[in-house]
Amino acid sequence: MAQIFNFSSGPAMLPAEVLKQAQQELRDWNGLGTSVMEVSHRGKEFIQVAEEAEKDFRDLLNVPSNYKVLFCHGGGRGQFAAVPLNILGDKTTADYVDAGYWAASAIKEAKKYCTPNVFDAKVTVDGLRAVKPMREWQLSDNAAYMHYCPNETIDGIAIDETPDFGKDVVVAADFSSTILSRPIDVSRYGVIYAGAQKNIGPAGLTIVIVREDLLGKANIACPSILDYSILNDNGSMFNTPPTFAWYLSGLVFKWLKANGGVAEMDKINQQKAELLYGVIDNSDFYRNDVAKANRSRMNVPFQLADSALDKLFLEESFAAGLHALKGHRVVGGMRASIYNAMPLEGVKALTDFMVEFERRHG
């Protein structure tokens, strides 16, 4: 079978070694003669999977002991509601920083539960899209928390600064597309959440890291399945969890640990991004309109100088084993998502194709 590199933004490419192990274990897991998808989530065998996954995840991100890790349903959009429902307490407003599509989506959902104080951080610098530095973010005095999205998959915009707003500011962040790609100081956040389908595992699982002093504040109308305290008290098993996604994510965590952990992923991700952006920047045929300080290392959107060639680019790249390069419908063009599971080899194959395509059509 020819090598395929999947540049999908999510569900995204998974490590080949993980898929191979899952394939080998699919019908006979742990010698039980059944699939992991068929065992009880409350049985000792799966409890071990769940406990190991949480431990490995904590190890990878150095999660402090005063933070709870929850394995949830609902995706990032579910957390757009869960955060205000759990963290507002008796307050009625929260600060929301708008830097792109997903931040705006979180704001739209939050309006159902509170009055967001929205700070538009988007700016244009020398004709390029950028984000105001955190020191310029205008936060209110009476907000229950501040929410932002460190990586915008559609816009290709990243906010790599570490929050430093003082101990009284509860920072909530949507890390769906950048979790585990670089070290983060978890202690600077009150809530971190991430849909699994980009850097963790299959779609259907969402991981929440929440500081324990924030538990117990849920709105009375908060659905039990979104209540952090209920999920924590029930070991993330208030109802039947997405067991296969949990199991496969656990395999990804072990793969990460075996391959140098988050620090090593950080180095490789930097190499991949530099290679791809280098080809774009050294060409008049391709362009990226994000300021270098805010370029995403996970999601690289780019446009061709002649959009009439877009269809041919996608057809030929697909035939070359470079899949899912079509840009999001909101922005068009191309987008290469190069999460942890994308090897440097895959990005090299893409850049080689781009250079050759430009030679023939530039």
UniProtKB/Swiss-Prot annotation:
Main localization is cytoplasm
| Domain of life per record | Bacteria
Tell me where in this chain the PTM N6-(pyridoxal phosphate)lysine is found: K198
Ligand binding (L-glutamate):
S9, R42
The answer to whether keyword Nucleus applies is no
- Give binding positions for pyridoxal 5'-phosphate: G76, R77, W102, T153, D174, Q197, N239, T240
What reaction does this catalyse?
O-phospho-L-serine + 2-oxoglutarate = 3-phosphooxypyruvate + L-glutamate; 4-(phosphooxy)-L-threonine + 2-oxoglutarate = (R)-3-hydroxy-2-oxo-4-phosphooxybutanoate + L-glutamate
Q: What is its EC number?
A: 2.6.1.52
Q: In which pathway does it act?
A: Amino-acid biosynthesis; L-serine biosynthesis; L-serine from 3-phospho-D-glycerate: step 2/3; Cofactor biosynthesis; pyridoxine 5'-phosphate biosynthesis; pyridoxine 5'-phosphate from D-erythrose 4-phosphate: step 3/5
> HAMAP family recorded for this chain?
SerC_aminotrans_5
Record's family?
Belongs to the class-V pyridoxal-phosphate-dependent aminotransferase family. SerC subfamily.
Known NCBIfam families for this protein?
PRK05355.1, serC_1
Q: What does this protein do?
A: Catalyzes the reversible conversion of 3-phosphohydroxypyruvate to phosphoserine and of 3-hydroxy-2-oxo-4-phosphonooxybutanoate to phosphohydroxythreonine.
Question: What is the protein name stated in its UniProt record?
Answer: Phosphoserine aminotransferase
